[in-house]
Amino acid sequence: MTVTEHRPWRGVLVATALPLDDNLRVDHGKYAEHCSWLVENGCDGVVPNGSLGEYQVLTPEERAKVVETAVAAIGGTRVMPGVAAYGSAESRRWAEQARDAGCASVMLLPPNAYRADERSVLAHYEEVAGAGVPVVAYNNPIDTKVDLVPELLAKLHGEGYIRAVKEFSGDVRRAYQLAELAPELDLLIGADDVLLELALAGAKGWVAGYPNALPRSCVELYRAAVGGDLGTAKKLYEQLHPLLRWDSKVEFVQAIKLSMDVVGRHGGRCRPPRVPLLPEQEAVIRAATEKAVAAGLA
């Protein structure tokens, strides 16, 4: 599925890692080149300012420029920025910034400064939807402590606040219940290591991590999975899964950046408080990435 006018969140949208220089400053030139390279290698778009993009440790000026850089590189239709913030008003301002920069959609976590109840979640998404740009919800109950269960997602969609959901709970059973409750709500794969399961359950897109390092093979995996070519999909999934599972680990940013370095891309360091991988972790990721390269998956 390629980018479409009305549902640009479909297909493979890469939650982009952010290149930093030796002084941990954002390297916008390398980031622009990375966005272009991803599209050239078959990805449908990018998601800047997600957790993989280290948005939590960016200044407001840096965060805004990251969006502008992506739009200048590949066009706003292909850019779906994360607009998460502690307050709804701030999230709305980020949605307005994305809209004004030319983005066609945004991705929004629920309130995450505290464990919000259903009424607060509804109010949060209503406020940000008021910016006038389509909103893709992001369900990450592991980190936010707010679970956008299928019944709540159906309410959010029914009110017109969201158009799709990035599902990171890991519970693939929810896909079927969500399809029953809100058949027009697009389900997006939110964790790399449940790609095949959610693709078979009807997912319309993938907000992806490991295409940062291995875009062509990851895109081939996604296309085969959603297209019903299970022979191709299962083989690729088995080959890539030793890496894909790192997307669901605490060290996912460091892991994906290391794999980028191994394949010759600019991964590099992370800003504090993220610390370098332990030697034994680095060895596992490096070996798995080198094995993928040797298998022709890079």
Regions found by a protein language model. Give the residues of each.
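Secondary-structure boundary/capping positions in well-ordered alpha/beta enzyme cores
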Residues: T77-R78, P134-V135, R163, L185, ...
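Active-site beta->alpha loop and helix N-cap motifs at the rims of alpha/beta catalytic domains
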Residues: T2-K145, K155, A298
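Catalytic alpha/beta core domains of metabolic enzymes, predominantly
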Residues: A131, I142-V250
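C-terminal alpha-helical cap/extension of soluble enzyme domains
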Residues: T2, P8-A17, H34-W37, N41-C43, ...
